């Protein structure tokens, strides 16, 4: 049986909030089978839980938020959610003593290291996947995102930025997903932004934690970070990272083929909701025998070592 995963032990880290610029303590805890992914704000009394749920997602200019029925929100969940998807973690409680998850270095890599440091525990309960049965496509102007049946998990993402720092040949990225591929090829890709946008937001008291420590920053001509890029195509790889996190908001790894052109958090979420709303388009599946499971989700050495 392919089993659900959680952490072996509690792990904690501190970072800076992108919005407030203040220190945030992040604590990730093991959870029993069928708990799902739960984000929890412990700065509120009583603490407020935000289960990962496609319908609770709100896209702001700066990040992805989860918002409950009382309009309470937790912000900047997308990169941690991508790390959970990448390592196939089904059950976890994530505490923060702030309104947001810390931004860390702007990628999913610090979260991957924390999760691997905590260790991955298999639970004696079958892991549920969402298997795509019919193609579903959403559009917004010239932007689109699509999910098709496929026995695995593949991603094909194209961006379209007319900017001297972003080479025209580095605007498409394809990935046959596995935990190893995610960690090595996707998790280290950082978010990016324009210096003028960051300066404008900070002048309005927003994005106070934004800096070159947690993003690729560009002006009209070049990348301003002293160390440059981690990959030639880091921009499109980060957009794929975002999509992996966005699609995991259903709480389950997806068996299907995702492709997108100029998509972002809002359109990715619109696609996920469109899939889930069409009961003919998907089904839950479990695997009694590992040999039946798509190679994409086989537990790699780095995860269960």
UniProtKB/Swiss-Prot annotation:
One of the GO BP terms on file: lipid A biosynthetic process
Q: Which cofactor does it need?
A: Zn(2+)
Name the top EC class.
Answer: hydrolase
Q: Which GO terms describe its molecular function?
A: metal ion binding; UDP-3-O-acyl-N-acetylglucosamine deacetylase activity
- EC number(s) per entry: 3.5.1.108
Hey, which pathway is this one from? Glycolipid biosynthesis; lipid IV(A) biosynthesis; lipid IV(A) from (3R)-3-hydroxytetradecanoyl-[acyl-carrier-protein] and UDP-N-acetyl-alpha-D-glucosamine: step 2/6
**Amino-acid positions noted as binding Zn(2+) in the UniProt annotation, renumbered to this chain:** 79, 238, 242
Matching entries from InterPro entries are given as: Ribosomal_Su5_D2-typ_SF, UDP-acyl_GlcNac_deAcase, UDP-acyl_GlcNac_deAcase_C, UDP-acyl_N-AcGlcN_deAcase_N
Taxonomy, superkingdom: Bacteria
Q: Which UniProt keywords apply?
A: Hydrolase, Lipid A biosynthesis, Lipid biosynthesis, Lipid metabolism, Metal-binding, Zinc
Recorded GO cellular component terms are:
membrane
Q: Which reaction does it catalyse?
A: a UDP-3-O-[(3R)-3-hydroxyacyl]-N-acetyl-alpha-D-glucosamine + H2O = a UDP-3-O-[(3R)-3-hydroxyacyl]-alpha-D-glucosamine + acetate
Q: Which SUPFAM superfamilies match?
A: Ribosomal protein S5 domain 2-like
Residue positions of the active site: 265 (proton donor)
Q: What does this protein do?
A: Catalyzes the hydrolysis of UDP-3-O-myristoyl-N-acetylglucosamine to form UDP-3-O-myristoylglucosamine and acetate, the committed step in lipid A biosynthesis.
Family the UniProt entry places it in = Belongs to the LpxC family.
Which PANTHER family does the record match to this protein? UDP-3-O-ACYL-N-ACETYLGLUCOSAMINE DEACETYLASE 1, MITOCHONDRIAL-RELATED (PTHR33694:SF1)
Q: Which HAMAP family match?
A: LpxC (MF_00388)
Name the record gives this protein: UDP-3-O-acyl-N-acetylglucosamine deacetylase
Q: Which gene encodes it?
A: lpxC
């Amino acid at each position: 049986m392919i089993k659900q995963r959680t952490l072996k032990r509690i792990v904690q880290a501190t970072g800076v909030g992108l919005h407030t610029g203040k220190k945030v303590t992040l604590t990730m805890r093991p959870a029993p089978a069928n708990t799902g992914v739960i984000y929890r704000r412990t700065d509120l009394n009583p603490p407020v839980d935000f289960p990962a749920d496609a319908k609770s997602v709100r896209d702001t200019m700066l990040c992805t938020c989860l918002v409950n029925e009382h309009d309470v929100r937790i912000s900047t969940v997308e990169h941690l959610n991508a790390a959970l998807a990448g390592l196939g973690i089904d059950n976890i409680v994530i505490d923060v003593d702030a309104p947001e998850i810390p931004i860390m270095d702007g990628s999913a890599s610090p979260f991957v290291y924390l999760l691997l440091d905590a260790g991955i525990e298999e639970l004696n309960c079958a892991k549920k996947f969402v298997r795509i049965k019919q193609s579903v496509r959403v559009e917004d102007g010239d932007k689109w995102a699509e999910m098709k049946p496929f026995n695995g998990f593949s991603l094909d993402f194209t961006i379209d930025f007319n900017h001297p720092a972003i080479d025209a040949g580095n605007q498409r990225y394809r990935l046959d997903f596995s935990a190893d591929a995610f960690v090595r090829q996707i998790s280290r890709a950082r978010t990016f932004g324009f210096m003028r946008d960051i300066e404008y937001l900070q002048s309005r008291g927003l994005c106070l934690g934004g800096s070159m420590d947690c993003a690729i920053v560009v002006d009209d001509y070049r990348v301003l970070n002293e160390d440059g890029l981690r990959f030639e195509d880091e921009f499109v790889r980060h957009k794929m990272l975002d999509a992996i996190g966005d699609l995991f908001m259903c709480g389950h790894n997806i068996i299907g083929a995702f492709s997108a052109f100029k998509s972002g958090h809002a359109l990715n979420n619109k696609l996920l909701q469109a899939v889930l709303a069409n009961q003919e388009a998907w089904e839950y599946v479990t695997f009694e025998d590992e040999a039946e499971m798509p190679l994409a989700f086989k537990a790699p050495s780095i995860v269960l070592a």
